[in-house]
Amino acid sequence: MIMAEKTENSTGRRPETDEITMSHVRDMSLAESGRMKIRWVQDFMPALVAIRARFEREKPFAGKKITISIHMEAKTAFLALCLAAGGAEVHATGCNPLSTQDDVAAGLASMGVETYAM
């Protein structure tokens, strides 16, 4: 049995308000690596970029709270950002510790999405 290393609860900040989020991720020092992976998705997945642009214009989720339990990796993190761009208050949690990428979780938290991925 593999035991998880001791972790620290870390916080991110919402970029638009500098408000502290309640995110809990394994290691916030990995955030830059996670943001790089999420930016890769933005560069190479034009369909999601188009969806985000539409959501930014129309704000279909304004005033809504959306919680997603997902395999925490770059493509699904970008999906969470798309929902946030649509006006939603997004909370994301990893659904499987074996598929959760700690750097992506930290990157997502640093980009203002409440992220729970220990």
Regions found by a protein language model. Give the residues of each.
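Metallocofactor- and cofactor-centric catalytic cores in central/energy metabolism, strongly enriched
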Residues: 4-118
